[in-house]
Swiss-Prot record:
Belongs to the TMEM53 family. The chain crosses the membrane at residues 170-190. This is Transmembrane protein 53. GO terms for cellular component: nuclear membrane; nuclear outer membrane. It is a single-pass membrane protein. It comes from Mus musculus. The keyword Signal does not apply. Negatively regulates bone morphogenetic protein (BMP) signaling in osteoblast lineage cells by blocking cytoplasm-nucleus translocation of phosphorylated SMAD1/5/9 proteins. The keyword Transmembrane helix applies. Expressed in liver (at protein level).
Length: 276
């Protein structure tokens, strides 16, 4: 079972509160219990994700929370090592372990760390026979995705490492900067032969369900322009997309600064996606 090998949290409400209506007669045909998978930002703790989880759990959704290890996000991905693909497969296998694979599925993805993992989820949904029939209804992106932004990535990594000894912190930051400069700038043409950057992969994704992008021009980690370019690219692929600029909130701080508005955006999006 994937659940024995993955450090995740799951919340299952006692009763589903979603009715699935028969479109012709208007009679209740059964119960839907949407599943929401939260993919956390780099260095995110489960207690941080739990605040977002509550938005959905209170409304009768099953919620799975997971944050990829920071060393995989910052180093494995930068080196072109697809170790997150294994995690993505285990996450999707959880749906079968809990026998919820037939329920509507929504992703809520945070920052580039969440997007890097989500990228492999998308690939598995399109290529893996077992996952091709999962019913994904929508994706929310919070504070991402961002294109190659070394300064922003260093800021994010510095935040994760702030409790580490100063010497170790400086060594890891220097090592990360060197890897990015080498593989994403100097050797970019060679790297592209065996590893496509997650931002480029997401731009050209074949997924067709609605997407909601929540970002801010005050974000110092992920550029608002990167998010807006992604919105434009997805619209060009005829995907139903909406972008919301919170203007003044910092990276992954939109819920904290605008709790009512943020919650209403997420809940309304979920309702619309599940009922389509």
């Amino acid at each position: 079972m994937a659940s024995a090998e993955l450090d995740y949290s799951i919340e299952i409400p006692d009763q589903p509160c979603w009715s699935q209506k028969n479109r012709q007669g208007g009679k209740e045909a059964g119960k839907q219990q949407p599943v929401v998978i939260l993919l956390g930002w780099g260095g995110c703790r489960d207690k941080n994700l739990a605040k977002y989880s509550a938005i959905y759990h209170k409304r009768g959704c099953i919620v799975i929370r997971y944050t990829a290890p920071w060393h995989m996000v910052f180093f494995s991905e930068s080196l072109g090592i697809p170790s997150l693909r294994v995690i993505a497969q285990k996450l999707l296998e959880l749906l079968f372990d809990y026998e919820i694979e037939r329920e509507p599925l929504l992703f809520h993805v945070f920052s580039n760390a969440g997007v890097m993992l989500y990228r492999y989820v998308l690939e598995l949904l399109q290529t893996h026979q077992r996952f091709r029939h999962l019913h994904v209804v929508g994706t929310i992106f919070d504070s991402g995705p961002g294109d190659s932004n070394l300064i922003g990535a260093l800021r994010a990594l510095a935040t994760i490492l702030e409790r580490r000894p100063a010497v170790l912190r400086l060594l890891l930051l220097a090592a990360f900067a060197l890897v990015v400069i080498l593989f994403h700038f100097l050797l970019a043409p060679f790297t592209a032969l065996f590893h496509t950057h997650f931002y480029d992969r997401l731009q050209d994704s074949g997924s067709c369900w609605p997407e909601l992008y929540l970002y801010s021009r005050a974000d110092k980690v992920v550029s608002a322009r990167d998010v807006e370019r992604m919105v434009e690219a997805r619209l060009a692929h005829q995907v139903m997309v909406r972008g919301v600029d919170f203007v003044s909130s910092a990276h992954v701080s939109h819920l904290r600064d605008y709790p009512t508005y943020y919650t209403s955006l997420c809940v309304d999006f979920m309702h619309n996606c599940v009922q389509c």
